[in-house]
Amino acid sequence: RKLAFRYRRVKEIYNTYKNNVGGLLGPAKREAWLQLRAEIEALTDSWLTLALKALTLIHSRTNCVNILVTTTQLIPALAKVLLYGLGVVFPIENIYSATKIGKESCFERIIQRFGRKVV
């Protein structure tokens, strides 16, 4: 029960701040975070902006969804998604952590959920 409550709370926080992670950080950390994101953009030739543009296009299509499979543990992965501003294109239900169960199990779950005819 504790675990179920914890995950419900995590989902609530994720959904509350997926459009406004700055609200979760507070003013001082928000400014540092924005500066860091600007530096990352400059050093990576706007990689994040371009990735977000592609993911937003996919997310806007009615028959398409973005799915994230990571080897990072779930809670740190969700934090990274929020910090990179990707929460708007990755619903929490579509983020899978392969840390404990492995990638193959994650993909089996995705196939069960969405079917085999996925791209």
UniProtKB/Swiss-Prot annotation:
UniProt keyword Transcription, yes or no: yes
Subcellular location: Cytoplasm; Nucleus
Cellular component aspect of the GO annotation: cytoplasm; nucleus
Gene Ontology process terms (BP): double-strand break repair; positive regulation of DNA repair; protein sumoylation; response to ionizing radiation
Cofactor(s) recorded in Swiss-Prot or TrEMBL: Mg(2+)
Keywords, alphabetical: Activator, Chromatin regulator, Cytoplasm, Developmental protein, DNA damage, DNA repair, Hydrolase, Magnesium, Nucleus, Protein phosphatase, Transcription, Transcription regulation
Family: Belongs to the HAD-like hydrolase superfamily. EYA family.
Name listed for the protein in its UniProt record: Protein phosphatase EYA1
Biological source species: Gallus gallus (Chicken)
Name of the gene encoding the protein in the UniProt record: EYA1
